[in-house]
């Protein structure tokens, strides 16, 4: 599949909008073509590590375009307190990579989940470990490393304030990843370098009043065969009205819930 195919698929709904607008004039939803393009983007945008193209220069304008999209994300009280720090300097990328590796080494010593052999996560562990090892070795080679941050600190805040703070920056970071993907650019969602956040802040002159939420190594990706990941069935973790209650499907029109333990 050619690289342009993905972008074409994502844009096909907009191209067809003019011809289908009359048909869907009374609906608040997207047309089938638009919905298919959006669903494809949402279900196939992956954290890219092994397939980041380390040799191809990255146009800064693509990052800026993706940020323009990202800041349309929800923000509590319309505060818009997010910040995007783009690092392309080779020496700084090398220093960031050192902090990332130090954080990764610490992470490896932490207790790991023990998934059962029939759990899809068990089968995915080796592949994810290999992907992480590749980024561990090559992080300093990516064209750009982007940090998404927000004003304020959360360490001493109550749960509601912490939720509000992260809820006002993480949607923008995810939108940034989606916008990059639509432009043929990949990113890896990682927080391991933040184990040493204060050292990172000193390296990049980040004020003490700022919280860094995520680090995103960014590069063009190779190939175009991204597909949905194997996930646990969401029905097992979807509740209605009360935690642990699932929707009763015995009646065609029933929305009652049954409690499941």
Whereabouts are the PLM-identified features?
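Bacterial N-terminal signal peptides that target proteins for export
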Residues: 1-8
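Bacterial N-terminal signal peptides
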Residues: 8-16
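Cleavable N-terminal signal peptides
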Residues: 12, 22-23
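Short acidic N-proximal helix/loop "leader" segments that mark the beginning
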Residues: 23-57, 61-65
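C-terminal helix-cap and adjacent tail motif
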Residues: 25-30, 44, 50, 211-261
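Small-aliphatic-rich amphipathic alpha-helix that forms the alpha element of a beta-alpha
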Residues: 65-71, 144-148, 152-203
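Glycine/small-residue-rich phosphate/adenosyl-binding loop
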Residues: 86-167
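A glycine-rich helix N-cap at a beta->alpha junction
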Residues: 105-116, 204-228
């Amino acid at each position: 599949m050619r690289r342009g195919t993905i972008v074409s698929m994502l844009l096909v709904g907009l191209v067809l909008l003019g011809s289908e607008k009359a048909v869907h004039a009374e609906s608040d939803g997207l047309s089938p073509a638009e919905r298919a393009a959006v669903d494809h983007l949402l279900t196939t945008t992956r954290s890219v590590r092994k397939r980041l193209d380390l040799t191809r220069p990255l146009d800064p304008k693509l990052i800026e375009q993706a940020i323009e999209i990202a800041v349309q994300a929800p923000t509590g009280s319309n505060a818009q307190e997010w910040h995007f720090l783009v690092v392309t300097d080779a020496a700084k990328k090398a220093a960031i990579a050192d902090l990332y590796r130090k954080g990764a080494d610490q992470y490896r010593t932490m207790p790991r989940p023990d998934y059962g052999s029939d759990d899809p996560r068990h089968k995915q562990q080796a592949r994810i470990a290999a992907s992480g090892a590749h980024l561990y070795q090559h992080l300093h080679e990516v064209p750009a490393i982007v940090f998404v941050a927000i004003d304020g600190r959360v360490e001493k805040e109550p749960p509601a304030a912490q939720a509000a703070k992260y809820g006002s920056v993480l949607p923008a970071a995810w939108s940034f990843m989606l916008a990059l993907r639509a432009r043929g650019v990949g990113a890896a969602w990682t927080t391991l370098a933040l184990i040493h956040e204060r050292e990172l802040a000193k390296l990049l002159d980040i004020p003490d009043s700022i919280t860094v939420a995520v680090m995103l190594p960014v590069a063009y990706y190779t190939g175009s065969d991204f597909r949905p990941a194997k996930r646990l069935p969401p029905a097992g973790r979807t509740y209605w009205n009360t935690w642990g209650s699932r929707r009763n499907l015995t009646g065609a029109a029933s929305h009652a819930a049954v409690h499941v333990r």
